[in-house]
């Protein structure tokens, strides 16, 4: 297996959890050593503390060739308190309930993208107003299921027939939906202990970085995996005329415990 396997690999997310100092650098060294010869587009690192952020900035200074694909992901509290400012590509995660009453730090920072997590209609309205107020361009609104807000999901996430036809669906998209999962394909998640998951953190590990190289794990997922190639080929979707027009199965189906998230019965 040569570097061809890396053509399928689009993004690696590394959750460094409680790692600090040398242990953190060792994990990053191992990940980067294995993917540097490929064409990885995104190496996303989930950061929890200011000391981790400083360690990673030093690590990146010593690995300039990684600059083009490395991006940070952190909660708003850490980002807002970063005394150095954010100059690297970064995604800030913010719960709707944590939106500051005053100005939104980094609102004008072109390096920053946003993930706003919402649980209710009111939170969705608050976030939408914030986006309009600051004219944010790079953002994602992420509904969070908490076992009590199914009506919110039924209203805002579940599909109607009109949603499917709200924009043109190309033949390429239809064919893609028949063979791969567009939400999960090409994505790996690496835990601080080296466990590697394909497509989602909810999936079982497909191996461990310290025991198997990433190229082999990509091959395993392509030939044996159940995440990247998870399509709508089960009931009731397999009996629906809109089977390949709908988006691929997502984590929401797994969390909510339903094979489909729609109001369509055809």
Predicted region positions:
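N-terminal pre-core extensions flanking Radical SAM catalytic domains
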Residues: 1-58
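A general structural motif
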Residues: 9-11, 38-42, 65-69, 87-89, ...
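Structural motif
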Residues: 14-20, 44-52, 70-78, 91-100, ...
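Acidic (Asp/Glu)-rich catalytic clusters
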Residues: 34-36, 58-65, 80-88, 101-109, ...
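Non-catalytic interaction/Regulatory regions outside core domains
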Residues: 96-101, 106-150, 257-266
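A C-terminal junction/extension of Radical SAM enzymes
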Residues: 128-199, 245
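Residue-level structural signal for beta-strand termini and adjacent loop
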Residues: 202-204
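Flexible mid-to-C-terminal extensions adjoining Fe-S/redox cofactors in radical SAM and related proteins
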Residues: 206-266
């Amino acid at each position: 297996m040569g570097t061809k396997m890396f053509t399928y690999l689009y993004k690696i997310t590394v959750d460094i959890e409680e790692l600090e100092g040398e242990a953190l650098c060792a994990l990053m060294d191992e990940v980067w050593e294995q993917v540097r010869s490929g064409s990885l587009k995104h190496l996303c690192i989930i950061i929890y503390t200011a000391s981790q952020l400083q360690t990673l900035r030093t690590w990146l200074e010593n690995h300039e060739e990684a600059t083009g694909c490395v991006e940070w992901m952190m909660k708003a509290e850490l980002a807002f308190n970063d005394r150095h400012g954010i100059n690297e590509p970064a995604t800030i995660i913010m719960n709707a309930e944590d939106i500051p009453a005053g100005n939104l730090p980094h609102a004008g920072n072109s390096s920053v993208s946003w993930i706003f997590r919402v649980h209710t209609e009111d939170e969705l309205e608050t976030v939408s107003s914030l986006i309009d107020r600051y004219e944010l361009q790079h953002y994602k609104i992420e509904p969070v299921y908490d076992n009590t807000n199914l009506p919110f999901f039924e209203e805002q996430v579940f599909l109607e027939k009109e949603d499917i036809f709200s924009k043109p669906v190309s033949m390429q998209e239809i064919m893609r939906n028949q063979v791969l999962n567009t939400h999960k394909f090409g994505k790996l998640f690496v835990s601080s202990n080296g466990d590697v998951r394909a497509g989602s953190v909810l999936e079982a590990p497909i191996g461990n970085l310290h025991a198997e190289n990433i190229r082999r794990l990509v091959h395993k997922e392509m030939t044996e995996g159940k995440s990247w190639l998870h399509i709508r080929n089960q009931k009731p979707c397999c009996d629906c005329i809109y089977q390949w027009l709908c988006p691929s199965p997502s984590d929401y189906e797994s969390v909510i415990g339903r094979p489909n998230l729609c109001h369509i019965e055809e």
